[in-house]
């Protein structure tokens, strides 16, 4: 073993790593926004907060991955949207606190650097950043042979946003009588996939299940998580929203109560939720109890807003899509979420 190729013989291809960096530069460039400083490749990403017109700035951060949805991306060899999922999981969490996403960093760990595949992953991250209006200012791609199989990789991200202190959404403004408005999800999003994979373990990704309206199963399962920043940020800045819940792991039951005080509860009208076909299929083929579906999945609503009754019309006018009135805030008697 010579010094020149010792690292390569141990399973780490430095040249492939350099190629990945070159390939992703054009995708990172798409995400440039006001405040981003420096170029890709520095030791740290930089952002100039003085460029922003914020009088009492509060930084809000979030980090997340995409769970075992990543295993389906690997199984179906489709890597161009999983990065958007990662961005969505982070920025949707910080917009729930009323923060505008500023910048994002990603972390990819893999058993073998495959430049073309990793470029697809980062292209998806960049697309998510464009949709969220945040800059992709850094990241890490770690080649770890022995830790991961050659075809395997993991993906995580970290987002930082900013809000005016008085506009922070922390649950303190939600009150009894507030109306619950829902924004539609694009699909399963990025939670519950260990169950999803079990339910469809013996079904081909190309299968055309009757419930899915002609779409291949793999396309439905890998539908990227929706990013809500463009719809919700104007509502926050206009002071129209009292609370926001991002419906992730734990479904309605775990996430909706995170946006209000312990003495309140959410009363949700099930028939007002636009249940997506994939959830009907999951319940049917997985033989999942109907009430349990609301403890796991978003069921067709990815974001829930708590809004004062006199501001509902303004919210609906400002959001350029259908808004679903799915319930209201009530005084808590027993459960934190009551589904009628």
From Swiss-Prot:
SUPFAM superfamilies: PurM C-terminal domain-like (SSF56042), PurM N-terminal domain-like (SSF55326). It comes from Streptococcus suis. Belongs to the AIR synthase family. One of its GO terms (molecular function) is phosphoribosylamine-glycine ligase activity. Transmembrane segments: none annotated. The gene is purM. The lineage of its organism: Bacteria, Bacillati, Bacillota, Bacilli, Lactobacillales. It holds the Pfam family AIRS. It is found in: Cytoplasm. The keyword Repeat does not apply. One of its GO terms (cellular component) is cytosol. This is Phosphoribosylformylglycinamidine cyclo-ligase. It catalyses: 2-formamido-N(1)-(5-O-phospho-beta-D-ribosyl)acetamidine + ATP = 5-amino-1-(5-phospho-beta-D-ribosyl)imidazole + ADP + phosphate + H(+). It is an enzyme of class 6 (ligase).
């Amino acid at each position: 073993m010579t010094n020149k190729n010792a690292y390569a013989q141990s399973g780490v291809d430095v040249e492939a790593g350099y190629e990945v960096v070159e390939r992703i530069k054009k995708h990172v460039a798409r995400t440039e926004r006001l405040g981003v400083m420096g170029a890709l490749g520095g030791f740290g990403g930089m952002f100039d907060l003085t460029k922003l017109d914020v009088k009492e700035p509060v930084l809000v951060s979030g980090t997340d991955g995409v769970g075992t949805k990543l295993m389906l991306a690997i199984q179906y060899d489709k890597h161009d949207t999983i990065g958007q999922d990662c961005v969505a999981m982070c920025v949707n969490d910080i917009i729930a606190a009323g923060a505008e996403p500023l910048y994002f960093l990603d972390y990819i760990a893999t058993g073998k650097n495959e430049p073309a595949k990793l470029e697809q992953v980062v292209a998806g991250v960049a697309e998510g950043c464009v949709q969220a209006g945040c800059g992709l200012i850094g990241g890490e791609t770690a080649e770890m042979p022995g830790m991961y199989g050659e075809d395997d990789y993991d993906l995580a991200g970290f987002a930082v946003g900013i809000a005016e202190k008085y506009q922070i959404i922390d649950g303190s403004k939600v009150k009894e009588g507030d109306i619950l408005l829902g924004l539609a999800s694009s699909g399963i999003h990025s939670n519950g996939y260990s169950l999803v994979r079990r339910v469809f373990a013996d079904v081909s990704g190309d299968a055309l299940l009757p419930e899915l309206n002609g779409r291949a199963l793999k396309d439905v399962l890998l539908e990227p998580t929706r990013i809500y920043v463009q719809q919700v940020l104007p509502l926050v800045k206009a002071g129209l929203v009292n609370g926001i819940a991002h419906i992730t792991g734990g479904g309605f039951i775990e996430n909706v109560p995170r946006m209000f005080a312990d003495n309140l509860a959410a009363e949700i009208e099930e028939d007002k939720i636009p249940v997506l076909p994939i959830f009907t299929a999951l319940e049917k083929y997985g033989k999942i109890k109907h009430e349990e579906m609301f403890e796991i999945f978003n069921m067709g609503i990815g974001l829930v807003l708590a809004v004062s009754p006199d501001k509902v019309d303004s919210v609906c006018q400002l959001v350029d899509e259908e808004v679903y009135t799915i319930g209201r805030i009530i005084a808590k008697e027993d459960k934190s979420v009551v589904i009628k």
